Swiss-Prot record:
<dbReference type="GO" id="GO:0006412">
    <property type="term" value="P:translation"/>
</dbReference>
<dbReference type="Pfam" id="PF02576">
    <property type="entry name" value="RimP_N"/>
</dbReference>
<protein>
    <recommendedName>
        <fullName>Ribosome maturation factor RimP</fullName>
    </recommendedName>
</protein>
<keyword id="KW-0963">Cytoplasm</keyword>
<dbReference type="InterPro" id="IPR035956">
    <property type="entry name" value="RimP_N_sf"/>
</dbReference>
<dbReference type="GO" id="GO:0005829">
    <property type="term" value="C:cytosol"/>
</dbReference>
<dbReference type="InterPro" id="IPR028998">
    <property type="entry name" value="RimP_C"/>
</dbReference>
<dbReference type="InterPro" id="IPR028989">
    <property type="entry name" value="RimP_N"/>
</dbReference>
<comment type="function">
    <text>Required for maturation of 30S ribosomal subunits.</text>
</comment>
<dbReference type="InterPro" id="IPR003728">
    <property type="entry name" value="Ribosome_maturation_RimP"/>
</dbReference>
<comment type="similarity">
    <text>Belongs to the RimP family.</text>
</comment>
<dbReference type="InterPro" id="IPR036847">
    <property type="entry name" value="RimP_C_sf"/>
</dbReference>
<dbReference type="GO" id="GO:0000028">
    <property type="term" value="P:ribosomal small subunit assembly"/>
</dbReference>
<keyword id="KW-0690">Ribosome biogenesis</keyword>
Amino acid sequence: MTHPLIPQIINLATPIAEDRGLEVVDVVFQTNKRPPVLRVDIRNSQGETSLDDCEAVSRALEAVLDESQVMGGSYVLEISSPGISRQLHSDREFISFKGFAVIVTTEIPYLDHKEWRGQLQGRDESAVYINQKGRAIAIPRELIAKVQLDEHR
C-alpha cells in the first residue's frame, strides 16, 4: 500500500525536477527506519543523470518540504537515479552527499571488514565518517580504496 504522503511529495518534487529537465520516476517513504527515509528517484530522459542533478534536486526539494511541513518531523531525504554508481573524490562531493548511502571499500581489512555500508557523515584529513544503523564509524583515509554512492539503498 502506498503511503498517503507519496502523492503530495510527487506534486512537490515534479516541478522541481522538471525545471531542471528531469523527471521523477519513483518515490519511496520508508517509515520503518528512524528517522524515516524519503527516497526520490529521478532521471534525465535525454541523457545521463549526474550527481549534480541529484544534488540540485535534493537542495531544492529539502527546502520545499521543510517550508511546507508536509513531513511533520525529522526525516532523511535521498535523491538518487537508476545507474548512479560514481565514486566520491572531492571535498565538494563529500559535502554534497552527506546523508547519502555509501559503500566504503578499504585496501586491507579494518575492524575485520573490507567493505562498509552506511550513511555518509563527512570526511576530514584523517578519516571518512559514516553512520551504520545509528553507530558512528570513522574509517582511516589511508586505508580507503574508494567511496561510492550505494545505488541499492
